[in-house]
């Protein structure tokens, strides 16, 4: 990318670097104090923003958390069923002759996916002239 730095931005960066070096050389204690102040202010702002964002999420955030929890629980149950069905099986890498007759194939029932109905404009007629 050939983006050219604006002259005003370059001057501000140069002045900031010069001021940083000047304070670092002349008064390093004050520099450390300013750094701690900036870090503490940043942490306070971060937690305020995080708190406000969590409050604004409201019912949508709660619904999402509930759906995620249900999904995790359902996946654990499916994995437990899957593992229980495969415990007695022999790996496909080993060839073990079977003494008994082969078992009939069991058809696995597909699990229903959880779908959400989105309400919309169902009665609106399509303009067939555009097709």
Swiss-Prot record:
Keyword set, alphabetical order: Cell membrane, Membrane, Transmembrane, Transmembrane helix
Mode of membrane association: Multi-pass membrane protein
Transmembrane segments: 5-25, 34-54
One GO cellular component term: plasma membrane
Keyword Nucleus: no
Cellular compartment(s): Cell membrane
Basic residues composition-biased segments: 66-92, 122-131
Region (Disordered): 62-131
InterPro entries: SA1362/YqhP-like
Annotated protein name in UniProt: Uncharacterized protein YqhP
Encoding gene, per UniProt annotation: yqhP
């Amino acid at each position: 990318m050939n983006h050219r730095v604006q002259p005003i931005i370059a001057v501000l960066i140069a002045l900031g670097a010069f001021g940083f070096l000047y304070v670092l050389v002349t008064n390093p204690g004050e520099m450390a104090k300013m750094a701690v102040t900036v870090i503490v202010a940043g942490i306070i702002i971060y937690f305020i923003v995080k708190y406000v964002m969590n409050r604004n999420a409201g019912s949508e955030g709660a619904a999402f958390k509930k759906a995620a929890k249900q999904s995790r629980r359902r996946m654990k149950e499916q994995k437990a069923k899957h593992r229980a069905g495969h415990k007695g099986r022999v790996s496909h890498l080993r060839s073990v002759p079977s003494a008994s007759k082969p078992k009939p194939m069991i058809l696995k029932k597909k699990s229903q996916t959880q779908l959400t109905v989105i309400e919309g404009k169902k009665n609106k007629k399509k303009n067939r002239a555009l097709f």
